[in-house]
Amino acid sequence: MNEYSSTKTFEGYSTAFRQWKAKHSHCQYLHGYAMKFKVTFIGDLDELNWVCDFGSFKRNGIKEHMSHMFDHTTIVAKDDPKLSTFKQLSEEKLIQLRVLDGVGCEKFATYVYNYINNIILKETKARVKVLTVECFEGGTNNSAIYKPIQALNNVDKSISH
């Protein structure tokens, strides 16, 4: 078995959120970024010599779900003390609210990893998996990479051979 990797970028999502626990920082206030995600897939090639058929993302709902979660949305942590206020804004059609375990590049990268990896593993019968997800806040701001420990161990083994 040979392992190849390929990368798909999802970008152009206008997303607002706040780090409510960051009382020492302006990040505690609602603010937004043009979010971008770089998803790296790893696995054997298929009969078309592709690691991953990116065209399938329309059919399997990945493209639509990414847009639903991150395009012109306000994402709030489920433990945000102002969650009820955000829910009211959503009910009044002032925001498109999404609630996640946490917010920020690290949490968004983890969410995207879990969502896409579950679909890809099923669709390819585990021939392909997500290796990493890198989430960018805007064009020049920071990014965070999510890579599960198991994936790190597999990469380390493949490098040492």
Locate each region found by the language model.
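Charge-rich, low-complexity N-terminal segments
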Residues: M1-H161
